[in-house]
């Protein structure tokens, strides 16, 4: 979702068209497929086509939280310094897969570890790689937000797709 970025986008770009899309996780199978839904691949293909026809400059935002750990997220113990360290190591390992600009490898790595730290928005992150096909990806910043009692930690980062 882009609700946190929306005021910034409107401030920077003014009254421009904004299209938001909710992309499902590639790690979770659809409960039932009636054949009436557009697949992620179909969506990406059509969006590329439409944007190509329209022309101009497109600014993409893929908003995602990374890890969600601690008792608030169903883990048995609170978040201590060791857990923070382990989460950052895991996050940076998964981010390195993303920075390789291979959506399938990124999803495969997340599937292999069963999304152990409960990342959100793996779908939109991998879809963005397929949509944009950047020449490079730069990790700009990485942060962890942990409540004072260690009940919950959520990590996030900012990246630039060049």
Enumerate the predicted regions with their spans.
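Residue-level marker for buried hydrophobic side chains located in beta-strands
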Residues: 60-62
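Flexible, D/E/H-enriched segments
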Residues: 1-57, 69-162
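Active-site metal-binding loops of divalent metal-dependent hydrolases
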Residues: 66
């Amino acid at each position: 979702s882009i609700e946190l970025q929306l005021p910034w986008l409107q401030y920077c770009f003014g009254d421009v068209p904004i299209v938001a899309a909710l992309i499902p996780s590639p790690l979770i199978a659809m409960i039932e497929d009636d054949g009436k839904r557009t697949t992620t691949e179909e969506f990406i293909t059509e969006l590329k086509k439409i944007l190509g026809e329209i022309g101009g400059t497109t600014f993409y935002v893929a908003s995602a939280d990374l890890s969600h750990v601690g008792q608030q997220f169903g883990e048995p113990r609170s978040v201590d310094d060791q857990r923070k360290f382990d989460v950052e190591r895991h996050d940076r390992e998964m981010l390195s897969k993303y920075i390789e600009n291979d959506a399938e490898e990124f999803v495969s790595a997340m599937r292999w570890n069963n999304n152990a730290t409960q990342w959100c928005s793996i779908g939109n992150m991998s879809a963005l790689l397929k949509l944009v096909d950047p020449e490079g990806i730069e990790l700009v910043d990485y942060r962890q937000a942990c409540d004072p009692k260690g009940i919950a930690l959520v990590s996030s980062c900012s990246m630039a797709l060049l």
